[in-house]
Amino acid sequence: MKVRAITEDDSRNYIDLCEKLDQETKFMMLEPDERTITVDEQKNRIQSLLSNENSMIFVAEDNGELVGYLGAYGGNVQRIKHRVHIVVGILQAYTGRGIGTGLFNELEKWSMQVGIQRMELTVMAHNEIGLALYKKMGFSIEGIARDSMFVDGKYVDEYYMAKTLPYARNGNYIYFNE
């Protein structure tokens, strides 16, 4: 298993990964068949993302297949350049193998290099596997968005979670064990 930064050459495989995630889990934003991006559009998005100093996508690769990703999307204005919003997706067949931990460790290494001080995410309140990973990685719940998602005919709450990175203030860095 290899965790690395995304490249433009990953465009087709990244779309395939996202489409698989849309099919197999209800915890992602898009319903199956709502994803309409082309390979060229994805290449442009990746190129644009990589040109932004405070945004990145890390992918987990197994024998040439993308099996997970973590996107970190930073703001463009001065007052929020220190924070990123995170989106994570890992194929169900690969959960419980340390991939999430590996993705977050890469995120934290990168964050230290580019000066990210705060990481934020949302997670559906009933996503126990996601919640466990995020808590393991040091995130805490900061709020609840009531009825913020509509899934399978029901409104679902989301937790707002965040982690403040201490090394951004004092130079220390802590790796998490896989």
What are these regions (language model features)?
Residues 120-124, 135, 140-156:
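Conserved catalytic-core motifs of GNAT/GCN5-like acyltransferases
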Residues 2-16:
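A short beta-loop-alpha structural element at the N-terminal edge
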Residues 97, 101, 113, 126-144:
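Conserved active-site alpha-helix within GNAT-family acetyltransferase domains
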Residues 104, 111-122:
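Conserved GNAT acetyl-CoA-binding A-motif
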Residues 26-33:
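A short, aromatic/hydrophobic, helix- or strand-capping loop or linear motif
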Residues 8-9, 22, 34-93, 104, ...:
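Acetyl-CoA-dependent GNAT
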Residues 59, 71, 85-89, 118-122, ...:
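Conserved beta-strand segments that form the floor/walls of ligand-binding pockets within enzyme
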Residues 154-178:
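Terminal substrate-recognition subdomain of acyl/acetyltransferases
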